[in-house]
């Protein structure tokens, strides 16, 4: 028997039936305050694009939504849509799953590249004085 996803005791189907105000009460305080202040313009545009993409997905078309809005909280109505989220350099594809509800979209892409240390340059340390030049 597979484990059923729940968020704060509510199943995914129950979450979809909740209004926005009822869902906001389930969120942690930081996310709740962010949504209660109102959505920014880019977040509103993203939500409208998500709704049209979800409607197209029901018709069998696969629409990908591109966005820079990393500070948007994932809502139950967004589940199932594929988005391309900008990480500062390129757009990374993310398919929104039910387990992502209540998190920020930006949590799912890394914005910085891990440092790969190479050979030390000249003057990098006192011992590099004795490294022969190329």
PLM feature spans:
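Compact, Lys/Arg-rich rRNA/RNP-binding cores from ribosome-related proteins
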Residues: 2-134
């Amino acid at each position: 028997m597979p484990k059923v996803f729940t968020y704060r005791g509510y199943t995914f189907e129950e979450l979809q039936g909740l209004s926005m105000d009822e869902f906001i009460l389930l969120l942690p305080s930081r996310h709740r305050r962010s949504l209660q202040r109102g959505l920014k313009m880019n977040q509103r545009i993203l939500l409208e694009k998500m709704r049209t993409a979800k409607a197209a997905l029901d018709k069998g078309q696969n629409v990908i939504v591109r966005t820079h809005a990393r500070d948007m909280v994932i809502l139950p109505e967004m589940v199932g849509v594929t988005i391309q989220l900008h990480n500062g350099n390129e757009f990374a594809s993310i398919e929104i799953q039910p387990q992502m509800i209540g998190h920020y979209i930006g949590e799912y892409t890394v914005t910085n590249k891990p440092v790969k240390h190479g050979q030390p340059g000249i003057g990098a340390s006192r011992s590099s004085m004795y490294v022969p030049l190329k």
